């Protein structure tokens, strides 16, 4: 209907408010990715597909999202433990094997993660405290599929349990 327009999907949480179940990591990742995308300058007009439910749910402020974003690339100096702490603080869940958005795993000199807003899972290869390479991999068989120059690390969740977020969600 409008091929020059960028269509951006903003889903509602896939659970009921005050339910015992939390939204899935994939849904929260999609929402965070959209909120980050809307802050980027673009030459194309944007169309946001959403529901009234999604539009009225509380989320992180634009300032808070910008505060939590990190750009990582080969040559960047960040220790594996520092990165693991950053991922934990940004709502990522540590697992033995990465299968879905919002998960990460630390294995020796490798950190596997599936960042919010990314189409593929990533494998960071460390040499000491320096990122040596960033490769994509298939979560189904864990095999490397390519190499990228870097990526933007977004929060995995809108419900971060720090002081500011707890105040905002009340």
Regions found by a protein language model. Name each.
Residues 1-170:
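ASCE RecA-like P-loop NTPase motor cores
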């Amino acid at each position: 209907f409008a091929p020059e327009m960028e269509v951006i999907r903003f889903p509602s949480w896939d659970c009921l408010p005050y339910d015992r179940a939390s939204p899935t990591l994939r849904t929260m990742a999609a929402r965070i990715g959209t909120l980050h995308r809307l802050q980027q300058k673009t030459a194309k007009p944007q169309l946001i597909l959403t529901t009234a439910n999604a539009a009225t749910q509380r989320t992180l402020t634009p300032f808070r999202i910008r505060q939590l974003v990190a750009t990582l690339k080969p040559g960047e100096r960040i220790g594996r433990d520092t990165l693991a702490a950053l991922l934990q603080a940004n709502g990522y869940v540590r697992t033995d094997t990465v299968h879905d958005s919002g998960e990460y795993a630390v294995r020796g000199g490798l950190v596997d993660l599936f960042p919010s807003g990314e189409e593929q899972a990533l494998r960071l290869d460390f040499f000491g405290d320096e990122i040596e390479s960033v490769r994509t991999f298939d979560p189904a068989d864990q095999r490397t599929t390519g190499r990228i120059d870097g990526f933007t690390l977004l929060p995995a969740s809108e419900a971060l349990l720090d002081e500011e977020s707890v105040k905002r969600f009340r």
